[in-house]
UniProtKB/Swiss-Prot annotation:
It is found in: Virion; Host nucleus. This is Portal protein. It comes from the Viruses. It comes from Epstein-Barr virus (strain AG876). Residues 577-613 are annotated as: Disordered. Forms a portal in the viral capsid through which viral DNA is translocated during DNA packaging. Assembles as a dodecamer at a single fivefold axe of the T=16 icosahedric capsid. Binds to the molecular motor that translocates the viral DNA, termed terminase.
Length: 613
């Protein structure tokens, strides 16, 4: 799964003292958490907003648009305007009665056409750049930052296919302008240069997957090194991890949430195990017993014996005696049997008038004595058997403890028993597992193996007994823990990256947006360290949430081109610009003509700085 092949020279440079940083079981789990493998909760959806490359796309768009539209001179704009005005004057003869309105409509038509042409040229070509595929992934950059605080980067050459695309982009930006105006040509040329730099930078740097990189720490030189496909690559350590006793602890949001995430995940796992165990059908062992054999005997006697069979009567007596657990019940059964049997006896004492007890009384006395003697013998026999079993139990317990001590000694540190290596590994894993974040099965095994745990019902002495026994159907609650984890995710991401929530009128959060601190913390290192886009200016938090159309309007309104056009409008149409009457003003090209008095009252504006440069 992981590409960890490092060449021989690199491995020699690392030495035996190198501490592995990634991939390790802990670091891989951090990336798996970001992918939603463990306890994905609602609060983690904010991370999807965090890794959205829309803010970086707006930054690139703002840079290209601002740089291109600002690369024009006052002389170019004036030349294009004079050229346009000359064409209009040839087609439309001048009329002094409507000269002011004519000038206003002419200049408004030219300025609007210029704005639309520039916007179409810029947006069409910038969109091609933004929506073309690049090898540099902003999403992977955010994954590395949130998981480890370090970002590996690989430099790669520009492909021939990309060179062809850049050449075709030059043809679209420079050679196909409408009218071949100077302003459009200058803007198109600068757009091509800026776009070429952006495309080459975004396609010459590659952020690999977390499964393709090996990162190690060299204590001797106090540096972190990264390897990709056997060769050393750049590694940007933005948030250095803490290393103590060979254990690496990253300074990242996911590392801080790790404990709580796995507590929630193991609770959900425990709840699922309990659900599966408690919903299983009850199981019972069915076998033949001697308790119900008397029913077959009674049925056989009922079919084959006479109506009054002594064997059946005696068997019924025994059955009724076995079903009664109290002395009064036994007495009633005996009384009933004697009453039935006395009716068939001939009482000689009563017949011949001899004194003494009657036959019924003698039978009753005989039967009672016999039954009591049988019960007494049975009870004594049960007590003797219980005493024997207790002695046997104590003997076997001593043997078991002796065997456990011998087994523990053989499985302890330094034991070389190959047959016991597998149980030793299992016992060691169960002993080292974290009860809160470890595997549920291993945690249960650890608890059962603990000498201080009393998880089973047992009777070890004469005075101990089981007070209660039951089957528990407990399922641990996970809803509250999931809710707490959601709030913890939100709090961690909001406070680490200084995100700003956007809510509706009811106070419900709709989405989150980048603040100025978020741009400095997250977007700044990506722009200047990873992508190496030094000419690009960081986008403001206002532009980070605006749509492309709103960004275009804002950038054009504050651009050099808009200022030049506005200045030309004030000089060419002073009445409409100042709000006064519609005076007639000559074009700027006719510099020797006199200006009207109301125009002289206000000093003419000097060309902005950089005009003609």
């Amino acid at each position: 799964m992981f590409n960890m092949n490092v060449d021989e020279s690199a491995s020699g440079a690392l030495g035996s003292s190198a501490i592995p940083v990634h991939p390790t079981p802990a670091s891989v789990r951090l990336f798996e958490i970001l992918q939603g493998k463990y306890a994905y909760v609602q609060g983690q959806t904010i991370y999807a907003n965090l890794r959205n490359p829309g803010v970086f796309s707006r930054q690139v768009f703002t840079h290209l648009f601002k740089r291109a539209i600002s690369h024009c001179t006052y002389d170019d704009v004036l030349h294009d305007w004079n050229k346009f005005e000359a064409c209009i004057q040839k087609r439309w003869p001048s009329d002094d009665s409507c000269a002011s309105r004519f000038r206003e409509s002419t200049f408004e038509s030219w300025s609007t056409t210029m704005k639309l042409t520039v916007r179409d040229l810029l947006t069409t070509n910038i969109y091609r750049v933004l929506h073309s595929r690049s090898v540099l992934s902003y999403e992977r950059y955010v994954d590395w930052i949130c998981a480890t605080g370090m970002v590996p980067a690989v430099k790669k050459p520009i492909t021939q296919e990309l060179h062809s695309k850049i050449k075709s982009l030059r043809d679209r930006c420079v050679c196909r302008e409408l009218g071949h105006e100077r302003t459009i040509r200058s803007i198109g040329t600068e757009l091509y240069e800026a776009t070429r730099e952006i495309i080459e930078s975004l396609n010459s740097t590659f952020i690999p997957q977390f499964t393709e990189v090996t990162i190690e720490y060299l204590p001797g030189s106090d540096e972190y090194v990264a390897y990709y496909c056997g060769r050393r690559i750049r590694l940007h350590v933005l948030f250095p991890p803490a290393i103590f006793a060979g254990t690496v602890t990253f300074d990242s949001p996911v590392q801080r949430l790790y404990q709580n995430i796995f507590m929630c995940y193991r609770t959900l796992e425990h709840a699922k195990i309990c659900q599966l165990l408690n919903t299983a059908p009850l199981k019972a062992i069915v076998g033949h017993g001697g308790r119900d054999m008397y029913k077959d005997i009674l049925a056989h006697l009922e079919q084959n014996s006479q109506r009054k069979d002594p064997k059946k009567e005696l068997l019924n007596l025994l059955v009724k005696l076995s079903e009664n657990k109290t002395i009064s019940g036994v007495t009633d059964v005996v009384e009933e049997f004697i009453t039935d049997a006395s009716n068939n006896l001939v009482d000689r004492n009563r017949l011949f008038g001899q004194p003494g007890e009657t036959a019924a009384q003698g039978l009753k006395k005989k039967v009672s004595n016999t039954v009591v003697k049988c019960l007494t013998d049975q009870i004594n026999e049960q007590f003797d058997q219980i005493n024997g079993l207790e002695k046997e139990r104590e003997l076997y317990l001593k043997k078991i403890r002796s065997m456990e001590s011998q087994l523990q000694a053989s499985l302890g540190p330094g034991g070389n028993n190959p047959a016991a290596s597998a149980p030793a590994a299992v016992a060691a894993e169960a002993a080292s597992v974290d009860i809160l974040t470890g595997s549920t099965a291993s945690a249960i095994e650890k608890l059962f193996n603990s000498p201080s745990a009393s998880l089973g019902a047992r009777v070890s002495g004469h005075n101990e007994s089981i007070l209660n026994s039951f089957v528990s159907q407990y399922i641990p609650p996970s809803r509250e823990m999931t809710k707490d984890l959601t709030e913890l995710w939100e709090s961690e991401l909001f406070n680490t990256f200084k995100l700003t929530p956007v809510v509706d009128n009811q106070g419900q959060r709709l989405y989150v947006r980048y603040s100025s601190d978020t741009i400095s913390i997250l977007l700044g290192p990506f722009t200047y360290l990873v992508a190496e886009l030094s000419p690009v200016e960081l986008v403001t938090d206002v532009y980070a949430t605006l749509g492309i159309v709103e960004i275009i309007d804002e950038l054009y309104r504050s651009s050099r081109l808009a200022i030049y056009i506005e200045d030309l409008g004030r000089k060419y149409c002073p009445a409409s610009a100042t709000g006064g009457d519609h005076g007639i003003r000559q074009a700027p090209s006719a510099r020797g003509d006199a200006e009207p008095d109301h125009a002289k009252s206000k000093p003419a504006r000097d060309p902005p700085p950089g005009a003609g440069s």
